Amino acid sequence: MAKNTKLWGGRFEGTVEDWVERFGASISFDQKLAKFDVIGSLAHVQMLGQTGILSLEESEKIQVGLKELLEELEAGQLDFDIANEDIHMNMEVLLTEKIGPLAGKLHTARSRNDQVATDMHLYLKEQLGYVLDKLAHLKGVLLDLAENHVATIMPGYTHLQHAQPISFAYHLMAYYNMFQRDSERFEFNQKHTDLCPLGAAALAGTTFPIDRQLSSDLLEFKQPYTNSLDAVSDRDFILEFLSNASILMMHMSRFCEEMINWCSFEYQFITLSDTFTTGSSIMPQKKNPDMAELIRGKTGRVYGHLFGLLTVMKSLPLAYNKDLQEDKEGMFDTVETILNSLDVLAGMLSSLQVNKEKMQESTEKDFSNATELADYLAGKGLPFREAHEVVGRLVLDSIKSAKNLQDWTLEELQTYHSLITEDIYVYLQPKTAVQRRNSLGGTGFDQVEYQIAVAKKANEAKK
């Protein structure tokens, strides 16, 4: 029987067949962690040297080899072998080819369990910075767009029915606030990602006199995990990221859904740049909002990665299990998906054209000013419920007569209630309706300008 030549092969008499090896290998995707694997190894071997577990000479020789590997990796000169299973074994084999048997000492006081957890913490810590940067850019684009459209009037909707006129900037600021909370969630995620598993070993720590705080400091983590079993067993920091990413994608998807509607022939509120649209292979007139649709579609993809890892984790006993190999691809894909989606959404918003006249016109041919009349009557002392009933009858009669509220004469309006006077026509104007809603958080122009000013100050402070 052939001898098992794996780095872990001493306990085995037989070998793993090639097709089984392919099933179990992860190098096809976990090679994304190569840089972080080397960085983690550099910190580990420095710690081994400084604590006397290895001699300083041994530590320095291993560091030289690792740094050469890092240079070759960055130059695209490393080839990985599926026979070595994963990125950790591949890097150790490559290091052995470079510096000989001394490479075997690198794994002293370390397991692949804490090694992979460290790699993933380092990877996600870096990516969270990119996500937050792109979110900040998107929020800046939103603020610039909102600042230019405080006085642009559009219908506000409930149940996809015209509800009340609002400022377009006000609508944009609603999304700004959603994206701001997304930023805050990712910032909190950073706290849980900024923990160092290195030195936890397989699950129970190690008998070697390691210095986990030193390893943590060298890798610029805030602190080590306080429980080694926890450090290698859980992936909640990834689940938290996937959850946050799912909420972010949901917010982007809702925004894209609205833009898809707004650029349709029925709305014509906005025109998307040619850069973010495509045509039809059969219908020459088409200009399809494909990029917005793709963001909407990719939202389900990110949801799937969250539910996939939740399902993987739900019944895992402590500590490490091979199931955890399934924690990476969804994380990698989610990072790529949200970074690209943030770029595309920011690009769409910075280049779209707003059709102000069409938005304004749509508020003049509906009954979104009905609440104004009800509030007008209530402001004159009529109980709101009575005012609501009066205006409801007037709306019904207007529909039957094919009229808008402002089309009725004063004498006709007064047949519905005597409290109505000549000034009602000012109140029924969409712009007046918007201006008057100056309660905190309202759509009044002063309130929207205040919201934008506060948001710009906060956004600038984060840069």
Swiss-Prot record:
GO biological process: arginine biosynthetic process via ornithine; L-arginine biosynthetic process
Gene3D superfamilies linked: Fumarase/aspartase (C-terminal domain) (1.10.40.30), Fumarase/aspartase (Central domain) (1.20.200.10), Fumarase/aspartase (N-terminal domain) (1.10.275.10)
Main localization of the protein described in the UniProt heading: cytoplasm
Enzyme class: lyase
Compartments, record wording: Cytoplasm
One function term, GO molecular function aspect: argininosuccinate lyase activity
TM annotation in the entry: none
EC number annotated for this UniProt entry: 4.3.2.1
InterPro entries referenced in this protein's UniProt entry, alphabetically: Arg_succ_lyase_C, Argininosuccinate_lyase, Fumarase/histidase_N, Fumarate_lyase_CS, Fumarate_lyase_fam, Fumarate_lyase_N, L-Aspartase-like
Reaction it catalyzes: 2-(N(omega)-L-arginino)succinate = fumarate + L-arginine
Residue stretches in coiled coil: none
Record key words, sorted: Amino-acid biosynthesis, Arginine biosynthesis, Cytoplasm, Lyase
Domain of life of the source: Bacteria
GO cellular component term, pick one: cytosol
Listed pathway(s): Amino-acid biosynthesis; L-arginine biosynthesis; L-arginine from L-ornithine and carbamoyl phosphate: step 3/3
Protein family per UniProt: Belongs to the lyase 1 family. Argininosuccinate lyase subfamily.
NCBIfam families: argH (TIGR00838)
PANTHER family (alphabetical): ARGININOSUCCINATE LYASE (PTHR43814:SF1)
Protein's UniProt name: Argininosuccinate lyase
